[in-house]
Amino acid sequence: MHPEVSEQQADGATEPSLEESAGDHSGAGPGVRKEEINETKETCVGPSTTSCQSQKQQSGDSRLDCRSGYARNDRDDRGPRMTKEFLQKLCKQHKLYITPALNDTLYLHFKGFDRIENLEEYTGLRCLWLECNGIQRIENLQAQSELRCLFLQVNLLHKIENLEPLQKLDALNLSNNYIKTIENLSCLPVLNTLQMAHNRLETVADIQHLRECLRLCVLDLSHNMLSDPEILSVLESMPCLRVLNLMGNPVTKHIPNYRRTVTVRLKQLTYLDDRPVFPKDRACAEAWARGGYAAEKEERLQWESREHKKITDSLEALAMIKRRAEERKKARDKGETPLPDSEESSSTSPEAQDKPPLGETQQKIEVLVEESFKAKDELFPEKPGGEEELAVVADRTMEEPDLPGSLAQSQTPLVATAEESTSSVAATDGTGIEDTEAIALENKERLFIDDLPDLEDVDGMDISMEDQTKETGIPKIQVISSLSDDSDPELNDSPLPMLEHTPTGSTGVLSNIFAVCKDSSKAARVPLTDIYEPRATTAPETQGQVFSTTPPRPLIQELEEDGRGENESKQSLPAQSSEDGDSQLPEATLLGDRAENEAQSSLDLGKPSPRASLEDIEFGLD
């Protein structure tokens, strides 16, 4: 519909109204009518001319210019910008560093950015996420020289460019873009992974640049429009290619026996499309390339037989382990020593394993026996010959097969006789276990007869005679108090070797006697119950001898000779009775009765000679 026709229709439509209005206004002049008509024409023509101009602008190239201008204005005014303030706020939101250079990762995906900008301060970035934005060009990455990973998938990129500053880039993701040619990647010397899925790659020339990417190991070309089988020649020239994805391309249908062919031609390939390339698959593919399907079938059977043999061997090994465990368990239940495994028994025999412990045990035994004989020679220099006895003991231990039992049997008399200083070495003498046991029994019997053999060498020690008599005389005073008056003392039955080294003066003897009397009341029951009663069960004859060797008569004679000792005894008896209470009164009365009876007998006998008095004193101390 043309503008002139519309103007005529508009004029025709307005003329009747004007005539009517003129009829209504018959009183108005013709000049007024013309002016009103002109005004209405101007008002009617104005909008039509503007609409015509707008229609002309919409036609042709001017229409595209208007659209691009409007898009630029909307993008500049309405779209989000990658400003410094926005980046700082984003770092704070993701709890990153406020200082830009300290950040190594920046998450800018799903933000709607249309360009890369204001990243000059982020010099330490190693990973940059720009996924799912509206970016149309790769730019402004000069400051990111440390970048390792760049994710630009799902954007509006049409070309690969401006990647020269990224000399350390390892992974580049350009999937879901509009890229038609792979280019400008040879400037990345360490590029390892390239993802180009869902792009516009079609021919061999589009991927020819991959020949220059010598370090590329992972390549994803899935869901493109590659259809020429010659792309395999380009992929063969990549020496480090390990992972390849060609799914979604027409070329997979154009290559016969696609998987076998690609596996054979790409020698280093370990993963193709959606699954790995196993050694068995590669061997079968190579067999197919040599002899067809028959060779492939034969190779597959060989691999299956080897795998089956491996499984059966493992099962047999498990069964063998189980059987050996059961045998060892049965032997252990029977009390037998379980035999070692066949491999261990072939390499090292049980005799060879037992030799080192046997030698070590023998050495220890010899050292122990030698030390014991040295100690014996030091104590008894008049009995040499320890070396000969050592040789005898060594020969005996060599002949005995059961070492632990012999050691246990030989250690028993040693412990039994270790209570005596002089008899500890004597237990190790002899040529057999029976001799040592006999010596131990003799020592036990002599222990109750000679009660104080250990105190023969006490002269060099710093122990007073009063303390010595306290230790040795307490049980004897208790026995004296427990004896009856009509007991017959046997003075010549047991000599006392302790008195050989005691002083013979009356003062020293009396002091020892009364020192014993002072301490006898305090420990009257303990020695009787703990020492003499257990020994009475083992050696009843010796107990009677000990009891009979304590006559009261010499004690009373000495008391008559020295009045001072009598006074001390009188003072000690009340003190003991007062301290011990009523429990000690019977002993005091017994001593008083004995004193009276023995005083009467001493008057009848008369005063003895000094020699007899000394002998009586020795027997009285017993």
Swiss-Prot record:
This is Dynein axonemal assembly factor 1. Residues 48-59, 337-351, 415-428 have a biased composition (Low complexity). Residues 32-42, 62-80, 326-336 have a biased composition (Basic and acidic residues). Cilium-specific protein required for the stability of the ciliary architecture. Plays a role in cytoplasmic preassembly of dynein arms. Involved in regulation of microtubule-based cilia and actin-based brush border microvilli. Residues 1-11, 539-550 have a biased composition (Polar residues). It is found in: Cell projection, Cilium. GO terms for cellular component: axoneme. The keyword Cytoplasm does not apply. Residues 1-80, 326-360, 399-431, 480-503, 525-622 are annotated as: Disordered. Keywords: Cell projection, Cilium, Leucine-rich repeat, Phosphoprotein, Repeat. Transmembrane segments: none annotated. SUPFAM superfamilies: Outer arm dynein light chain 1. LRR repeats lie at residues 101-123, 124-145, 146-167, 168-189, 190-211, 215-236. It comes from Peromyscus polionotus. InterPro entries: Cilia_flagella_integrity, Leu-rich_rpt, LRR_dom_sf. Residues 249-288 form the LRRCT domain. Its main location: other. One of its GO terms (biological process) is axoneme assembly. It comes from the Eukaryota.
